[in-house]
Amino acid sequence: MLIVILTCALLVIYHAAAAEELEAKDVIESKALATLDEERFECVLKCDIQYNGKNCKGKGENKCSGGWRCRFKLCLKI
């Protein structure tokens, strides 16, 4: 009987630790996605989109941050 109780306790601890790891991964991934969305939003607001395929340029800037460029009338991550 004691072995059954200890086994169940170990399983509960293992699953709790695994759940915490998954939660931590979800937080990191959502922050990364939020950063990409912010950079894209920044690019869309700051860029003058060129029809001839030149790099997008903000006011006084050579490039958009985060690797974004204006291509095909869209702000794309390159």
Swiss-Prot record:
Coiled coil: none
InterPro entries assigned to the protein according to its UniProt record, in alphabetical order: Hwtx-2-like
SUPFAM superfamilies: omega toxin-like
Disulfide bond residue pairs: C43-C56, C47-C70, C64-C75
Main location per the UniProt record: secreted
Protein task: Probable ion channel inhibitor. Shows insecticidal activity when injected into mealworms.
Protein name: Toxin OAIP 5
